[in-house]
Amino acid sequence: MSSLVDPEIIELIYLASQAGVKISLIIRGVCCLYPQKKNLSENIEVISIIGHFLEHSRIFWFRNDNNSEVFIGSADWMKRNLDRRIEAVTPIEDLELKSQLFTLLQTYIKDDYFSWIMKNDGSYEKYRFKSATCLLYTSPSPRDEQS
């Protein structure tokens, strides 16, 4: 997505991290969440992809064991969008569409040309893909499913 600034959503993401949920977020622009902070957000990573185009997909992939729920939507998680606008989010149930979205997320996560990773102080450093842990993705993440 483009931005994550809504304090209520951020608090819920922190709570999920504290409960042990692994979370990967791909946020193009403003992100008010701080990843990798001890006892707060140790299970969260934030990747920013800055390319030639102002592209930012709003794909939400939730996974628990082998159960995946995938959604696409129109809103960035900003207070003005969630509280004062009409936005839409819809589930993706078609397996072929899910597969295509998974491939897209893999492409984003593996990108090491346009990607930056947010450090726990809010600064960014150039991202180098590693086979470790888009959008919210609970454990295991798309990286865990690579072969």
Provide a role label for each language-model segment.
Residues M1-E45:
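Primarily the HKD phosphodiesterase
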Residues N120-K126:
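Short proline/glycine- and acidic-rich turn/helix-capping motifs at secondary-structure junctions
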Residues W77-M78, K130-A132:
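Short proline/glycine-enriched turn/loop segments at secondary-structure junctions
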